[in-house]
Regions:
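… and, occasionally, acidic/histidine-rich disordered N-termini of signaling adaptors
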Residues: 26-170
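Acidic/polar-enriched heptad-repeat coiled-coil alpha-helices
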Residues: 2-3, 9-10, 16-17, 23-24, ...
Length: 170
């Protein structure tokens, strides 16, 4: 009788352990599914951001109006990129071509690239800027203002490295 009771106790203990293991497994599966769902939402959101980033970059047909012999190699490390290229006609008819590498990779870099393109477009649309130096100076001022930087050590060091070329297309 004592041996049967011991066996019954061990069986109940094993059943309890089995239920706990199954409960832990179910929890792990729910957490895995939740993480997978969150990852999908984040990836979908970043893909949508990629479409926005592509929309602000010059299109091939736009580039063809300014340039005849060119190529574009744009390969983001992540879905979105901190790199950008830009081309426009200045008020005096010359062409400005920019290639930039913004601080940060992925989403932070993409934010900076969209900021850079937007500010460049604003400078050309609303200010009389016709030299590469003036354009870069104005862009620098506007990036500092947009990021609320004051030149202090504790400021973020966000920005961009840019090559800017102004050419006479005639």
């Amino acid at each position: 009788v004592a041996q049967n009771q011991e066996i019954l106790r061990q069986k109940e203990e094993i059943e309890a352990q089995k239920e706990e293991i199954e409960s832990q497994r179910d929890l792990a599966e729910r957490q895995r599914d939740q993480i997978a769902g969150q990852q999908k939402q984040i990836t979908d959101s970043i893909r949508y951001a990629s479409r926005i980033q592509s929309a602000v970059m010059p299109r091939t047909d736009t580039l063809a109006t300014f340039l005849t012999d060119y190529f574009i190699y744009f390969q983001p490390k992540n879905i979105v990129s901190g790199d950008f290229f830009w081309v426009t006609r200045l008020n005096d008819g010359r062409i400005a071509i920019a290639v930039a590498d913004c601080t940060g990779h992925g989403v932070p870099g993409a934010f900076m690239s969209i900021l850079g393109i937007t500010l460049l477009k604003e400078i050309i649309a609303y200010q009389q800027v016709n030299t590469a130096g003036d354009l870069l100076d104005k862009l620098r001022q506007m990036v500092i203002a947009a990021l609320n930087q004051s030149g202090q050590v504790q400021d973020s060091h966000d920005g961009m490295d840019m090559g800017l070329l102004v050419v006479d297309a005639t």
